[in-house]
């Protein structure tokens, strides 16, 4: 799999500029602004209804803001038509809490689904890439199984394989560990970190578990041992990671773990405690 361009190129994967959106007269996002540099990871937090998933839908062009500007991979999605957005989404991998696998298709067919939309790819190449993606999530043995034969955690891992098979420039995760037990959640987080540290793919992660993001900020995937390695105190992973916290539709924090640990904001201190 290929990696995204380095953030040192000065490129930005996502930019939100003063974005507002309301539903039925209820203002969900109020002047949201943030940037995700290429190759970096940003974790979004906030109480239920804070607008985290709405941000992902806006980035995909599934929703249009009432005002403001959203740029994704250099494209102004607020001005794009559906046909143009379809092409852009082909450069984005998505993993949601509900893995949404097709029960009538095998694991192999599910993972290959997005490749089927591309032209000029030989069956042998599709099979190779499917096995490569499943090997990455350590599920190559499930290639001929059906989703009904998999556990919830395994289904989520297949969803990750499907998201990365097209070598996306951007990954969007919407509560990828939601509904999973702690052990399985840790497995999913490890795979997300593996993708981050091996391929440096730009990622926007919505999570309800602060523990997941703290693990990501204080550990690094070690390719030689195929395990996570805790970083020495004061050392941080090679791939920059930041935290964005929402409250009442506004960004109240956007910074790294050092800044988060030293914040004076009482609401944030209580939220992360």
Please name every model-derived segment.
Residues 171-174:
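Catalytic Walker B motif of ABC-type/P-loop ATPase nucleotide-binding domains
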